[in-house]
Amino acid sequence: MGFAMRMNFVDVVVSDSLKHYYVDGKKMGYQFDIRLSYYRGHFLSVIDEFKVKVDDFEVPAERIKFCINGKEFSPVEFDKCYTEFWRVIEPATIKVIYPGGLPEGEHKIDVTLFFRSPYMPIGPDHRYMPVDSCGTKTMAITDKGGKENVLCR
């Protein structure tokens, strides 16, 4: 991607949010929260690029669930989510299907998130201002805690 506007309002990856999630008592993966680093919310349909890397390993899109408004979406569904609004004050939970979870310790989380601002046209042919809402954070995960099932917010 060429030029993209960047506004650093918040850390994209929410501190201390990395944890395992369980389904029927079995560790099925891990999750963490992200925020939109922008001054207003947007519909999921304006997200043009979304990727997750953990410890420099790119997570396949089919293993990612983007949880918001009590619903789960795969990144390949974003273009159809024109009624799902991500409020700027609400974090989204990113669930990664990874049976057995991550090993205990620190892990580097990289989120690539580019969206277009639909009220900022920058040229002909329905082109809009791209916005960079990417983020990186190193967080620790432990096996301490419950084995409760985790639902989307």
Descriptions of predicted regions:
Residues 1-153:
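Terminal leader/tail segments of proteins
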